[in-house]
Amino acid sequence: MSHIRNFSIIAHIDHGKSTLADRFIQMCGGLSAREMEAQVLDSMDLERERGITIKAHSVTLHYKAQDGKTYQLNFIDTPGHVDFTYEVSRSLAACEGALLVVDAGQGVEAQSVANCYTAIEQGLEVMPVLNKMDLPQADPDRVKDEIEKIIGIDATDAVACSAKSGMGVDEVLERLVHTIPAPEGEIDAPLQALIIDSWFDNYLGVVSLVRVRHGRVKKGDKILVKSTGKVHLVDSVGVFTPKHTQTADLKAGEVGFIIASIKDIHGAPVGDTLTLSSTPEVEVLAGFKKIQPQVYAGLFPVSSDDFEDFRDALQKLTLNDSSLQYMPESSDALGFGFRCGFLGMLHMEIIQERLEREYDLDLITTAPSVIYELELKTGETIVVDNPSKLPDVSSVTDFREPIVTATILVPQEHLGNVITLCIEKRGVQRDMQFLGSQVQVRYDMPMNEVVLDFFDRLKSTSRGYASLDYHFDRYQSANLVKLDVLINGDKVDALALIVHRDNAAYKGRALTEKMKELIPRQMFDVAIQAAIGGQIIARTTVKALRKNVLAKCYGGDVSRKKKLLEKQKAGKKRMKQVGNVEIPQEAFLAVLRLDS
C-alpha cells in the first residue's frame, strides 16, 4: 500500500491538464507509440471537437522511481470548466493529493483558485506545477508569486515543466511520489468501496469506477449496494491503463472498475458504498453533496413518437452524469417532454448534443430559466423553475431571485470594461483586491443575468484574459415580471420569460423584432405582441403575402377594382380566424440571443 499514489490533476481551462496526462501515460508505458494520440483520455467525440474535457477519466500506471521502487499511480484527469465542478469534486474524493497545473504564461485564473480550494477543503495535499515553460511568454517568477498571493500555498519550489515538449515531466513524477501521501486503509478489514462514477454499457450493464477504502474485491464475490440493499455477483474487476485491463482483485487504496452485470440503471448510484454481502453492517462512506441544478430548460422531442426513446436516453445519461436532473412536463405548443436541470449553459449545450449524437434524437430546447422563490398571499413560499408555471401576479406578495457571488480575475488594463459589464448586468460590487498584475473583483449578481451570456461577453470585453468563477449565495427580493409572447392573440407558453421590470420594455421590443425575422410570412398578417399581464408593451406584424388581384384590370370603372380588393380582404380575414402559425425551432432560441 505504501507504493500507491492517488491524485487528481486540477487546473483552469486550457492550462494543459490532458496533455500532462498524455505525457504521464507515455513515460510510464501505458500505451504503445502506435496507440498514442493527443489528449488520449478525451475519448468522447464532443471532447475532441471542442478541445475540452467533459468527463473525468481515471488511469492506473506503474512508475519506476529513481529510488528503485515501482509505484502504482492512480490519477484522474478532471474538467476545467465551472459547469463541471461536480466532476472535479467527485474525483477529488477518491484521492489523497492533487496536482495544481498553472499555465506559466497566463498565470493563476479563477478556476484554478476554485478547484484548489475544493481540494484543500477535502484535506488533500496540493502540489503546484508550472506548465507551458516552453512558451516565449512564460514568466515563472511572476506566476509563483501569484500562486502564493492569490491561492496562498507555498510555490517557491514549484516544479517547472512543459507537457507539450516533455521537459521536466519526470521531475514532476519524482516530486509527486514524495509529496503526495500514500492511501490509508486495511486490506484485511471488510470491503468498503466508494462509487466515483458509473456508466451504462449495452453488453456489460452498469460499469462502476470505485475507490476501495478497506478490504479487497475479486471476481466471483457477492457485493451489496448499500443504498438499494441488492446483492450482485462480480463478473470482473480491473483498472484502466488507459485500456480496459482486468486484474485479479482490487485492494484497499486502489481505484478501478467493477462490473457486476447490474441491468437496472439506478442499481449503483454515484456516491454510494459497496461492500460484500457477508458483511452488510459496514458503515456507509460519506458520499458527495447532492448538487443543485442552476439552470432549467424544457427539452422536447421534435416528433412525439420519440418520447420513450428520449426517456431511456435521459436515464442512461443521468447514470453517467449525476448532476443532470429531469422531470416530465408538457407544453401546449410542443407536446410532451422533460424539464431538465443543468449546472450552466455549457452543460446544457453538451447534454443536448450528447443526446442528439449518442442516442440519435431530434430535440427542441426552450429558453433556459433559473429558480425563483415566490411568497404568496396565503403565506406559503413556492419555487418556480418555469415561467409558464407562474401563478397570477395578484396572488404574489414577494418575488425573489437567486443571487450569485461572482469572482472575476482580470489584468488591470481590462478592469474598466469588466466593471461596466457587471453594472449593466445589475451587479453590486463586494470588494476588489490588487494582486500583482491582476485584480480580483467580487460581485453579487442575479443568476439570471450570469447564466445566459455573461461568460461570453466577459471574455470578449477583456480580450479573453478575464476568468470567472461563481457560486449561489442567496435569494433576494426583486421587481420581476413575467413577459408573455402572444402570436395572433394566443399566448405561446414556451416563449414566456421572467425579466426585471426596468428591462421589460426593451426586452419585449427586442424579442418581437427577433420573432418577426424568424416567423415565415403567411397568407395573412401575423401579429406578434409582448405583454406583461394584460398590458401590451410591444408589437410587430409579419406582413401577409398577397396576390395582386388588380393585375387583370385594364382601365374600367373603379368600383370593379374596389370589389376585387374587398373580396380579397374578406378572404384574408376569414383565413386569419382559422389559420394557425407554425413556429420554427429558431424562434424558441431567439430568446437566448436577445443581446447580440
Swiss-Prot record:
Stretches that traverse the bilayer: none
Record domain tr-type G: where: 2-184
Disulfide pairings: none
Pfam family membership, one: EFG_C
Enzyme nomenclature, EC number: 3.6.5.n1
Catalysed reactions listed for this entry: GTP + H2O = GDP + phosphate + H(+)
SUPFAM superfamilies in alphabetical order: EF-G C-terminal domain-like, P-loop containing nucleoside triphosphate hydrolases
Keyword ATP-binding attributed: no
Enzyme class: hydrolase
Purpose of the protein: Required for accurate and efficient protein synthesis under certain stress conditions. May act as a fidelity factor of the translation reaction, by catalyzing a one-codon backward translocation of tRNAs on improperly translocated ribosomes. Back-translocation proceeds from a post-translocation (POST) complex to a pre-translocation (PRE) complex, thus giving elongation factor G a second chance to translocate the tRNAs correctly. Binds to ribosomes in a GTP-dependent manner.
Record-linked PANTHER family: TRANSLATION FACTOR GUF1 HOMOLOG, CHLOROPLASTIC, TRANSLATION FACTOR GUF1-RELATED
Name of the protein described by the UniProt record: Elongation factor 4
Source organism per UniProt: Pseudomonas putida (strain GB-1)
Lineage: Bacteria, Pseudomonadati, Pseudomonadota, Gammaproteobacteria, Pseudomonadales
Gene name of the record: lepA
